[in-house]
Regions:
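C-terminal cap of metal-dependent C-N hydrolases
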Residues: 375-426
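Divalent metal-coordination and catalytic microenvironments
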Residues: 10, 26, 31, 56, ...
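Histidine/acidic residue-rich metal-binding segments in metalloenzymes
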Residues: 140-304
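Alpha-helix-loop-beta-strand connector modules within alpha/beta enzyme cores
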Residues: 109-128, 172-185, 332-336
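Active-site mouth loops of central-metabolism enzymes
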Residues: 66-79, 126-139, 158, 207
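His/Asp/Glu-enriched, well-ordered alpha-helical/loop segment
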Residues: 203-230, 297-298, 303, 309-381
């Protein structure tokens, strides 16, 4: 028997530049969108299908993650490509863009871009091609060949190449109109700093990261954008109020992203723990967080990235200052940001989707997600569901460094239409 479900009423957000329909209706057949509104009601009536009330839930396009890391995509004890796309889809993500890694996944040549798109999965996996050979910032990779082979853009991950090499690449222009994703981060200035400098960091007793480790490279990248206005330079992971202020002063601004954790919390938070404090870029204080949210609302920052950096159990046994920085957990992003931005800060659903889906698509240069008849690219979000994420959930990420584990979360993606690899228990 063909499975049909009529959601009526349900809140519906069709796509960018659309407003939420507060009393909409949608007919689903075998996981695909069959019809909307009165057409959906009439088709359900003709088929003898009753309605399922979902007036508080939101039917919306899938989310898009601009950048995340995956050190061991095809093997390993922790997160793999299979577990990542499964958990990302459970969190409503229909597209992921993976950064090149410092390990064996540099993706410096076209043949390293193969094998990431599974035939049994509708989560689109985009790949950032390596900007420099070995990520060393000395020699350029074959940019044109990488773009032609399907790289979504170019990046050296968490490393910022030297300015002369960046200038050379932008002058050569082999990236064309594809984004060049660079973190405004001076690793030398940051040194061993773990938290952004300030009273909270001093009270915590951890090494501090000076503000200049972001503002100095940000000024350099801003100048490069002025000199190469035809290039799509993109700032990865803005993290300070000073950085937002600098962007405001520019007449020609590079695009910018921010990680969800910097929007959600700060080093001032009493809920912060050692495990969730240490991310890249360094976590700032309440002023930084407020400025980042303002930058998003004003369009200075176009995308909230997950920037997942999964660790396995063994890696998490190391002291926080001796292991790779970062957190993971695609399933936790939408519920957390809904509470922070919609419930607490008065954002609309349209605003939230612009920075979690439509803006990220535009930044990547791909078609924006949109609800359409015959498509399975949709999610159903219930903001009132209270649940506790656990690693035993077959849809959960396999990363050990998920800061929202084992604590109640409000809001959850209760259904998502896109296909993913079957769970091991299925």
């Amino acid at each position: 028997m063909t499975e049909m479900i009529l959601l009526d009423p349900v809140r519906v957000l069709v796509g960018p530049d659309q407003t939420v329909q507060e009393h909409g209706a949608a007919l689903l057949r075998e996981g695909c969108l069959e019809a909307f509104g009165d057409q959906a009601r009439e088709a359900a009536r003709a088929a003898g299908i009753g309605s399922t009330a979902a007036g508080h839930q939101l039917l919306a396009p899938c989310l898009v993650d601009v950048h995340s890391l995956l050190p061991e995509p095809f093997q390993g004890q922790g997160e793999t490509l299979e577990s990542l796309v499964r958990s990302a889809a459970a969190g409503g993500y229909g597209q992921l863009a993976l950064l090149p890694e410092a390990s064996g996944n540099r993706r410096e040549l076209p043949d390293r871009l193969r094998g990431f798109q599974r035939s049994d999965c509708d989560v689109a996996v985009h790949l950032w091609g390596g900007f420099s050979q070995g990520g060393q910032g000395e020699q350029l990779t074959p940019h044109a060949d990488l773009i032609e082979a399907g790289a979504i853009g170019l990046s050296d991950g968490n490393s910022m190449p030297p300015v002369p090499l960046l200038d050379r690449a932008l002058t050569l222009g082999e990236s064309g109109g594809s984004p060049v994703l660079i973190p405004p981060l001076d690793a030398v200035l940051r040194g061993e700093g773990l938290l952004r400098e300030g009273p909270e960091a001093l009270r915590a007793g951890w090494p501090t990261d000076p503000l200049s480790s972001e503002t100095l490279p940000l000024s350099q990248l801003a100048q490069l954008q002025q000199e190469h206005p035809e290039r799509k330079l993109t700032l990865m992971g803005l993290s300070t109020a000073a950085g937002v202020d600098l962007l405001k002063q520019l007449s020609l601004r590079p695009a910018a992203t921010v990680s969800w954790w910097h929007v959600l919390t700060s080093n001032s938070s009493s809920a912060a723990t050692a495990a969730s404090w240490f991310v890249s870029p360094s976590l700032g204080d309440r002023t930084d967080r407020a400025a980042l949210i303002e930058g998003l609302s004003e369009g200075l920052i176009q995308a909230i990235a997950v920037h997942a950096s999964p660790l396995d159990d063994e890696e998490c046994l190391l002291p926080p200052d001796q292991r790779q920085r970062g957190i993971a957990g695609h399933q936790h992003v939408l519920p957390s940001l809904w509470q922070t931005l919609v419930v607490s800060s008065g954002w609309t659903a349209e605003q939230l989707w612009d920075v979690l889906s439509f803006g990220p698509s535009r930044l990547l240069g791909v078609e924006e997600e949109r609800l359409s008849q015959g498509s399975n690219r949709w999610l159903l979000f219930d903001p009132d569901v209270i649940w506790t994420p656990t690693r035993s959930d077959p849809w959960a990420s396999q990363a050990a460094n998920q800061p929202c584990l084992d604590q109640p979360l409000s809001g959850r993606v209760v259904q998502c239409g896109i296909r993913t690899p079957a769970c091991p228990a299925d």
